[in-house]
């Protein structure tokens, strides 16, 4: 990344120009604990930078606080349902409070893995073949059509919650039942064997991709947040041409969904070198294990600069 590109990522706004900033975190989704960690890290960075910021753990009384507190803008650090799926974005639109990240439509689309895949399939970017599971017969049909191994996913969860790799019909049925406890809609996808990459985007630019390695069967919740043996490769290990191809694919994936502000795109590469899109995260993690801060460091931004850049985009996008 050039020096000019790095400088364009940084916010040039004075901290006080942001006004009073509410950091929204916590919530009631299955990703609450991750959101609490992310939100507290973001809040500390804003306060250390001199921003007039305060935190709201989004619970039963948060709407009253949003209405009663004088809030100039909101920094959304809610992961999963209720915060990353367009509902909070829609509420803030109604209250005329500018906020960070993508808007209502892009947030709702990206949170719905099935709809995201359908958009990508219509526009060309490759994404693994899949099926929707509603009963045991669907599991049997999916096994016949897609073969094994497969990966099972709740359609509206993040952080790999409820996901499982399966190698038989019995395992598939068990994984579908487990995933159904998180979501009424469950997807099963062809397993792509090969290295995994994640590509962060910030203010319209693609950050250095990260190669991921784990001794787990895939990059699951433990590997993301708890394990000490997860490997992160920056540079990502691809040659220049492949890395450029990966970055262009991530940019196309985000453009197709209508992503704004910041995001993170997850991609697999198969044995033939072909890239496959998995999903886009519109409110990625901001913990000490998180990937966007890691990519930002590789681009020359420390955590505080990253947080200010995300917040600055809310000014440009929504006033």
Swiss-Prot record:
Binding positions for ATP per the UniProt entry: 143-198
Regions that span the bilayer: none
Gene Ontology CC entries for this record: cytosol
One Pfam family it belongs to: Dala_Dala_lig_C
UniProt KW keywords: ATP-binding, Cell shape, Cell wall biogenesis/degradation, Cytoplasm, Ligase, Magnesium, Manganese, Metal-binding, Nucleotide-binding, Peptidoglycan synthesis
Function: Cell wall formation.
Family the UniProt entry places it in: Belongs to the D-alanine--D-alanine ligase family.
NCBIfam families listed in its UniProt record: D_ala_D_alaTIGR (TIGR01205), PRK01372.1 (NF002378)
Name this protein carries in UniProt: D-alanine--D-alanine ligase B
Organism name: Pseudomonas syringae pv. tomato (strain ATCC BAA-871 / DC3000)
Designated gene of the protein: ddlB
């Amino acid at each position: 990344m050039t020096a000019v590109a790095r400088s364009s990522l940084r916010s040039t706004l004075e901290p006080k120009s942001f006004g009073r900033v509410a950091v929204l975190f916590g919530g009631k989704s299955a990703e609450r604990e991750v959101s609490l960690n992310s939100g507290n890290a973001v809040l500390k960075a804003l306060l250390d930078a001199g921003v007039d910021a305060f935190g709201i753990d989004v619970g039963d009384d948060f709407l009253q606080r949003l209405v009663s507190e004088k809030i100039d803008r909101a920094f959304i650090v809610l992961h999963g349902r209720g915060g990353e799926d367009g509902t909070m974005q829609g509420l803030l639109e109604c209250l005329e409070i500018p906020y960070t990240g993508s808007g209502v439509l892009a947030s709702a689309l990206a949170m719905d893995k099935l709809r995201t895949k359908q958009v990508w399939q219509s526009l060309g970017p490759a994404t693994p073949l899949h099926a929707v599971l509603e009963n045991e017969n669907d599991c049997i049909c999916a096994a016949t059509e897609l073969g094994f191994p497969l990966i099972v996913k709740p359609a509206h969860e993040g952080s790999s919650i409820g996901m499982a790799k399966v190698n038989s019909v019995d395992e598939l049925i068990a994984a579908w039942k487990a995933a159904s406890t998180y979501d009424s809609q469950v997807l099963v996808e062809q397993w792509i064997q090969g290295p995994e990459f994640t590509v962060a985007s910030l203010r319209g630019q693609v950050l250095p991709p990260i190669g991921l390695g784990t001794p787990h069967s895939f990059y699951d919740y433990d590997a993301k947040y708890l394990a000490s043996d997860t490997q992160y490769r920056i540079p990502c290990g691809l040659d220049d041409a492949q890395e450029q191809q990966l970055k262009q694919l991530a940019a196309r994936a985000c453009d197709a969904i209508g992503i704004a502000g910041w995001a993170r795109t997850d991609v697999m590469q198969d044995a033939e070198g072909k890239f496959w899109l998995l999903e886009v995260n519109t409110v990625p993690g901001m913990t000490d294990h998180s990937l966007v801060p890691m990519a930002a460091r590789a681009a020359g931004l420390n955590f505080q600069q990253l947080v200010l850049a995300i917040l600055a985009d809310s000014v440009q996008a929504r006033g």
